């Protein structure tokens, strides 16, 4: 898996972070034999764990550095949050929001078992963000929204970066940047396929 990602030009810091995260711990037992295949896999409740190449792409685009505060929308099984926690380091903080109670428990258990104490899993409507800990240096959204939710734009810090899939019939991965004056820019990075973001500002 790592060799393939390296061949695709993934940043070395991202590769190192992904090497450290035992992906099989974030999968159901009957899926663990496929843990290091470059494909999305079901984790229950009509949700998936993203393919490793997509995790790598999003982390590359986010440009996470040590000590950052990160918001993730869509915890799933906790894998993506673990990779970002590795990138943010022990002085960083990851908040990850999940709407499905069973996945909240799953992500918490997986992250605790894997030793990630700098990740907090919250049960809430992720399309509204998590205002109590804003602003965030980076925001990662792991489900597709019809448009960029206004609360997420507001909760992004100045000089912050958000990566989010956007679209209805067709989905595009979008990089949202906020400059030092608070101006917002959007850049489309290519077509993707994600599960829908359900919530007030989702579907």
From Swiss-Prot:
Keywords: Cytoplasm, Methyltransferase, S-adenosyl-L-methionine, Transferase
Active site: 50
Pfam assignment, any one: PCMT
CDD domains: AdoMet_MTases (cd02440)
Enzyme nomenclature, EC number: 2.1.1.77
GO CC annotation: cytoplasm
Superkingdom of source: Archaea
EC class: transferase
Gene Ontology molecular function, alphabetical: protein-L-isoaspartate (D-aspartate) O-methyltransferase activity
Keyword S-adenosyl-L-methionine: yes
GO-annotated biological processes: methylation; protein modification process; protein repair
Catalysis: reaction(s): [protein]-L-isoaspartate + S-adenosyl-L-methionine = [protein]-L-isoaspartate alpha-methyl ester + S-adenosyl-L-homocysteine
Cellular location(s): Cytoplasm
InterPro entries: PCMT, SAM-dependent_MTases_sf
Family in the record: Belongs to the methyltransferase superfamily. L-isoaspartyl/D-aspartyl protein methyltransferase family.
Entry-linked NCBIfam families: pimt, PRK00312.1, PRK13942.1
Function: Catalyzes the methyl esterification of L-isoaspartyl residues in peptides and proteins that result from spontaneous decomposition of normal L-aspartyl and L-asparaginyl residues. It plays a role in the repair and/or degradation of damaged proteins.
Protein name per Swiss-Prot or TrEMBL: Protein-L-isoaspartate O-methyltransferase
Annotated gene: pcm
């Amino acid at each position: 898996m790592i060799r393939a990602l390296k061949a695709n030009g993934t940043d070395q810091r991202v590769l190192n972070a992904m090497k450290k995260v035992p992906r099989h711990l974030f999968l159901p037992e009957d899926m663990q034999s496929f843990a290091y295949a470059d494909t999305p896999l079901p984790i229950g409740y009509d949700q998936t764990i993203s393919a490793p190449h997509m995790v790598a792409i999003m982390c590359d685009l986010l440009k996470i550095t040590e000590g950052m505060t990160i918001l993730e929308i869509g915890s799933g099984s906790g894998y993506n949050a673990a990779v970002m926690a590795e990138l943010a380091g022990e002085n960083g903080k990851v908040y990850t929001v999940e709407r499905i109670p069973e996945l909240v428990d799953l992500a918490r258990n997986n992250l605790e078992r894997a030793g990630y104490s700098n990740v907090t899993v919250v049960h809430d409507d992720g399309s509204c963000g998590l205002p109590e800990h804003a602003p965030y240096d980076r925001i990662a959204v792991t489900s597709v929204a019809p448009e960029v939710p206004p609360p997420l734009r507001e909760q992004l810090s100045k000089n912050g970066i958000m990566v989010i899939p956007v679209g209805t019939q067709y989905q595009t991965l979008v990089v949202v940047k906020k400059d030092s004056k608070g101006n917002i820019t959007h850049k489309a990075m290519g077509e993707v396929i994600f599960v829908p973001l359900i919530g007030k500002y989702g579907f």
